Curated annotation (Swiss-Prot):
It comes from the Bacteria. NCBIfam families: glgC, PRK05293.1. The gene is glgC. Alpha-D-glucose 1-phosphate binds at Y101, G166, E181, K182, S192. This is Glucose-1-phosphate adenylyltransferase. It comes from Bacillus anthracis. The lineage of its organism: Bacteria, Bacillati, Bacillota, Bacilli, Bacillales. Belongs to the bacterial/plant glucose-1-phosphate adenylyltransferase family. Pathway: Glycan biosynthesis; glycogen biosynthesis.
Length: 376
């Protein structure tokens, strides 16, 4: 029998991330590189470690190999524990065949046995594809104080963007009275962040109920949460005010990387009290040549810079040759940029080779972002 845990986290990391185009052709979205040395999933795993959540089940499905290799036994996030720690939970085969996860609720339902072994009081459900720093222990305290059945973390979004999100309509006490999935005419701008805390008994009961319903799409937002509301359960909205970014598109991924270069950013990677952990790439120090010029940029280990880099994020092992300019761009691990190249407002994928004299910038709309990656 596993050691009893007060709260167990379940991290949904099986997303395809199709809006990221070629970046996720052979890679699960949570494994996409971010911020010069991280992967998207590092933020959620680091939040767990910093919040004192010591038992994390990671549910994978789409293109899982590189993500599995990256996570390993969880030692990068201090989650390699004798009891608990990180457990990767891909779909598994039964006598009737492989049981694929058909939705977010289905993924958790198929792993109820994993949760049961810990006899948790609470289950924290997370998404592995957002960029943010959050103390989950404060949300758990709120959930307990409010005597909620379910608590959902929400963030205020601009009204003109509210129709892109699952929106929570609440009363004055922040109790959720209605949940609307991407409403055309939203009545609130409190968007669900896809972070839920359930009382374990409630979660188990309603996932089993959802699984028995042949009409259900087995999704928390579309099926389980509306059912809980219909049956009068107490759902509380937990307001979050920090930095949070859904990096589900090429442009939003680029924007989040550019946010790291601001003088005043609420996503401070230098915060010693809330570190973001990652797997060390074991590269040599970066080299900046005498004639190179670097301004307002994040340059990671193993880079060789002989040209100009301005307001950009370069991952490990990137080469920028003489006469080249990289401006307002993100260059992913191992990319080689030849001589006299101009790259502006672009994301260059991992291991890409940009030939001498190439010019890459938005052609029509100057606000666009260009993606150069395998398969494009």
């Amino acid at each position: 029998m596993a050691q009893k845990q007060k709260c167990v986290a379940m991290l949904l990391a099986g997303g395809k991330g199709s809006r990221l185009s070629a970046l996720t052709k052979n890679l699960a979205k949570p494994a996409v590189p971010f911020g010069g040395k991280y992967r998207i999933i590092d933020f959620t795993l680091s939040n767990c470690a910093n919040s004192g959540i010591e038992t994390v089940g990671i549910l994978t499905q789409y293109q899982p190999l590189e993500l599995h290799n990256y996570i390993g036994i969880g030692n990068a996030w201090d989650l390699d524990r004798v009891s608990g720690g990180v457990t990767v939970l891909p779909p598994y085969a039964e006598s009737s065949g492989v049981k694929w996860y058909t939705g977010t609720a289905s993924a958790i339902y198929q792993n109820l046995n994993y949760l049961s072994q810990y006899e948790p009081e609470y289950v924290l459900i997370l998404s592995g594809d957002h960029i943010y720093k959050m103390d989950y222990s404060k949300m758990l305290d709120y959930h307990i104080e409010k005597e909620a059945d379910v608590s959902i973390s929400v963030i205020e979004v601009p009204w003109d963007e509210a129709s892109r999100f699952g929106i929570m309509n609440t009363n004055e006490e922040m109790e959720i009275v209605e949940f609307e999935e991407k409403p055309q005419f939203p009545r609130s701008n409190l968007a669900s962040m896809g972070i839920y805390i359930f009382n374990w008994a409630i979660l188990k009961e309603y996932l089993e109920m959802d699984a028995r319903n042949p009409e259900s799409s087995n999704d928390f937002g579309k099926d389980v949460l509306p059912l809980l509301l219909d049956e009068g359960k107490k759902l509380m909205a937990y307001p979050f005010e920090g930095y949070w970014k859904d990096v589900g598109t090429v442009k939003s991924l680029w924007e989040a990387n550019m946010d790291l270069l601001r003088d005043e950013t609420s996503l401070n990677l230098n915060d010693r009290d809330w570190r973001i952990y990652s797997v060390n790439p074991n590269e040599p120090p970066q080299y900046i040549a005498e004639k190179a010029k670097v301004e307002e940029s994040l340059i990671n280990e193993g880079c060789v810079i002989e040209g100009d880099v301005k307001h950009s994020v370069l991952f490990q092992g990137v080469t920028v040759e003489e006469g080249s300019m990289v401006i307002d761009s993100v260059v992913m691990p191992g990319a080689k940029i030849g001589k006299n190249v101009v790259i502006e407002r672009a994301i260059v994928g991992s291991e890409m080779v940009i030939e001498d004299g190439t010019i890459i910038r938005p052609e029509k709309n100057v606000d666009d972002v260009v993606l150069i990656a395998e398969g494009k």
